[in-house]
Amino acid sequence: FSPPSSQNPAVIDCLIVGGGPGGLTAALYLARFRRSCMVIDAGSSRASWIPRSHNYPGFPPGINGNDLLARLREQARGYGARLEQGRVEHIEPHADGFSVRYGDATCVTRRIILATGIEDTLPDMPDVEQAIGEGKVRLCAICDGYEVDGDNVAVYGEAENAISHAVFLRTFTDRVTVVVHGEPNACDQAFALAEHYDIRV
């Protein structure tokens, strides 16, 4: 890892697109490596939906997603990371790296980290956002499997992917049903797996 550049200080060493836990952790490390960095955050991190996360290290009783984001922002800022609200709309090559437009502003950066995460397709049901906030609807089997211990669980989604998640959730409960979005098109192997683990489709 080379020492910080002494080139044009108006050029950011690294721009991070996305202000969720991944993007903010990258900003923290870059700032501690004495690199100039900026996070552009559209404010739509999945973490903000989490009522309480129990699998983020260092918080034994768990932590609310928005509280976690606030702590990560504070820590990154404390080392000099710059955090901006906005949505990146255009990136193009530049003599010093890349020119990036976000909202009415532009910046030039030597490197870019894309930490945009994923965007969930929410089920078409009333009050789904409230249900997520209450922990009744969950978006991540890996993150939340432990919390469904012994409960009745419905996995909603495209058949093959939903069956895969349902098999994982059988680690925590034997009462798993797959609710298929659209036609139940899945390979024979996926249906055989569901039958083997006594998962209703």
Predicted regions and their residues:
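Short glycine-enriched loops at secondary-structure junctions
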Residues: 42-45, 119, 159-160
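N-terminal Rossmann-like dinucleotide/flavin-binding domain of flavoprotein oxidoreductases
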Residues: 48-106, 185-199
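Short, glycine/charged-enriched secondary-structure capping and boundary segments
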Residues: 30-31, 52-55, 126-130, 168-171, ...
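FAD-binding core/adjacent interface of flavoenzyme oxidoreductases
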Residues: 1-15, 38, 83-151
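N-terminal glycine-rich anion-binding loops that anchor highly charged ligand groups
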Residues: 36-49
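General small-molecule cofactor/ligand-binding pocket signal
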Residues: 82-84, 138, 179, 200-201
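Glycine/Thr-rich phosphate-binding loops of Rossmann-like dinucleotide-binding domains
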Residues: 48, 122-123, 163-164
